[in-house]
Amino acid sequence: MDIRRLTDRLGGLAFGGDYSPEQWDAEVWKQDDELMRRARVNLATVGVFSWALMEPEEGRYDFGWLDAHLDRLHAAGVAVDLATPTASPPPWFTLAHPDALPVGRDGTGLTHGSRDTYCLTAPAYRRAARRIAAALAERYGDHPALALWHVHNEYVTLCWCDHTAAAFRVWLRARHGSLDALNEAWGTAFWSQRYTSWEQVLPPRTSQWHRNPGQALDYSRFWSDEALAAYREQRDAIRAHSDRPVTTNLMMPGYQNLDLWALGREVDVVSVNHYPDAPGVDAAAHAAYDADRARSFAGGAPWLLMESGTNTVYAGDRTLAKEPGDVLRHSLAHIARGSEGALFFQWRQSRAGAETWHSAMVPHAGPDSRTFREVTATGEAVARLGELAGSTVRAEVAVLHDSAAWWAMNVDGLPSSELDYPTALRRAHRALWDAGRTVDFAHPEHDLSRYRVVIAPALFLLTDAGAENLRRYVADGGTLLVQHFTGIVDEHLHARLGGYPAAPLREALGIRVEEHRPLRQSERIALTDGSTATSWSESLRTEGAETVAAYTHGMLTGSPALTRHGFGSGHGWYLSTRLDDAAYAVLVGRLLTEAGVTPDLPGLPAGVEVVTRHAPDGRSWQLLINHGSEAAPLPQPAHDLLTDAPLSRLPAGGCAVLRAL
């Protein structure tokens, strides 16, 4: 695996961050060398936003300043993750190529003065990006400091310009083959939308009312493919001159412009940016959710936390500060779930510019600060964990995750505004995290045989192949929980006829949904098992399944709300409403118990997070984080790698890494 090349080069796990020496003078650079040694920094990301310096005018490159910094970092024992600067074109580029500026859905054109001011489909942009990637690789491909290539930064920008329209049409021709096929897929017989020439076809720009759902979904697919193509062009330009591994950073959690399963197959190292959006235990659960997603997109292989925050991060209308100890806790939370280190944005907090108040490893207050002391302590901790490099995480439970299903639930006109795919994903993961079980994410068409329990939350779009795969999983002995609004449409967003969900899945579940009945926003309904539910209900009938709980509400009184069906060697559960959190936790706990899924370290109190990493040679390590307010006794004393001492109680807020005997 290519990430092992990185950790071998570093001599252990990675620790460091995004480094922008061009923002500072020579005196600060000298301080940086010393402070990086103190913090045990061994990897610095360089060049992310440096296009204007690297190429001050079109076709003329100036790498002298970069030579000096890479040489200096190498002399200081710091390896480099060298970025292509293509996420932020310089002003000269947009003036020379105004057609490369992005255009919003409503037709508003943007200009330079910020970042991400480009259209991925603009030929001039793509040429310039390839050229600078090739120039960097030719110059630094075998530089002794170079450990990793970092293509671009956060592929999140969208565009609806004329270049995009032309590229979209090319993509649609390749996907559908003919206008007749496109018209059928998009259902253009409705609202008189039938296309009679390709020139009539546009991206889903702002229009009078709802966008065509098939058009919107295909645009999401197209844009993901376009971003992947842009990444591959730079990656291939680099590989022509360098054999070092290549990555690009996936933006977590809410950005879903890319099919992250597809991107995971294209990079040598899966790397992610993660900034928890809530304090306390919610932030810890959020970190686990994104770390488990990253590992899953890496195919279960080790991956890398490329960016996180040491302290304040932007959260809506304010910056929120982390609590003491969070730098270590959040770093270890990602390492526990497969990351081969912890890096931050950025090394030194900017004194000017748009992200002046974004936290950094060295804050405005300097090294004599709580933040830098925590950074140094975290660097020391990470340095002690080198033996974990190359180890992996195993899970017996999976939550199904499909980018197409996510995009499908963003289309206009769904039956309820409360239907939200990422919320459903996070809720399922949170229940499993609270129960102390390690979780993978899996695609509905993946091989699911290694999982004892699989949860399918809100898979609105489900292909025939996916439905058949889930049917087979249950028949072969798996426990499957399917939640409401799953299997409703096919890959074209065509509604399933004859009852929901898709026919193969109905067979495994032993039910047939006839009607959706969204609830009013403040409405709560009771079920016969004493639980309550909100948001959604369905009229369904059993076709072999047993009713576990029924509705006690209106016309659905007595109708099944939660069912269980023995099918083949397994069991298919169906939940037709949104249970309250406590009842949902009970349901998930029952599934885990019946399937024999146990915690990694039984006997610990609630609030102690435990994940096990396994080495190919049979060694294993248990990483513990106590999110509770009281010390937690361990089931038996163990040796803690962080303190190099025996440990019998984990303090409140404390962390430990135990080497299994």
Task: Describe these PLM feature segments.
Residues 10-15, 40-42, 74-80, 142-147, ...:
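Short, well-ordered coil/turn segments that N-cap beta-strands
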Residues 106-269, 276-287:
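Polysaccharide-binding and catalytic clefts of secreted carbohydrate-active enzymes
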Residues 14-25, 47-64, 111-130, 152-159, ...:
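The substrate-binding groove and active-site-proximal loops of carbohydrate-active enzymes
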